[in-house]
Amino acid sequence: MKKKILLTIGCLIVLLVAAGGGYVWHVLHSVRSTAGQMYDTGGGSGNHQAITSKKPINLLLLGVDERKNDRGRSDTIIVTTLNPGKKTMQMISIPRDTRTEIVGRGTTDKINAAYAYGGTKMAENTVCNFIGDIPFDFYVKINMEGMSDLVDAVGGVTVNNKLDWYDEGYYKKGYHYKRGEITLDTGAKAMGYVRMRHKDPQGDFGRNQRQRDVIMAIVRKMSSVRSVSRYQSILKALGGNVKTNLTYDDMKNIVFNYRDAGQHSVDYEVKGSGKMINGIYYLVVGDAEKQRVHEMIADQLGD
């Protein structure tokens, strides 16, 4: 459940856990400078001891649309919990239109507005409050334009498309996305695929699923890359579009300590009711659903 990995593109964590130890270990030895380029403490310094001790960790994955002179909003919000003991990776997506308190601002708004108002830290505090005051150990933020760069870097991806439509939206390229297995051979074509919402009867939920599919397709493609030139293109795409408070050593420790967490994956999207409030559409999440999400995360963080 996620709008644009995730890192859902997936996000660096998904890539590290899902790609497998051997190849990623080789990669990490070669990406110290890239890791340094990605390192940022905008969301806090991180809980490095948890990774060293092989404790369950909670990560906030943000997909943002940042452009020059525009911070944008975090249209992808995924709470990812890794538990090496239970060998599970749980990913809970929070729809961008979710109505909630914006912590630090004293207002109620769409949850994706927190990033626009106060950057990573306000987004982290707001999501933490929404899930019942469960803190995050780390965050990973990707500029979603970077998904386009990554698809180009891996040489395109193949996905199973459940709908049939022409792109008349964000890119307006007129691409025809046929139902069934299709190849998104360029970043632009992939972006048109993951951004479409209005032609999908499931709206945001359907878009989130397509984004997850593309993220995992990127993960699979990355895990099989052996070309040096392709590898360098991937590093460039990551370094230019990802920010995280995970250090290089944290990434290495994730490879060793959390590789089993990818054996069982739990994917969930927060549910609610769509409502118009003062002329604005929101997804209103009930208390029972919030409690369910809180308990799902708390359970995964238990030993």
Question: Where in the sequence are the language-model features?
Answer:
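Non-catalytic, solvent-exposed segments at the cell envelope interface
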Residues: 2, 10-11, 19-303
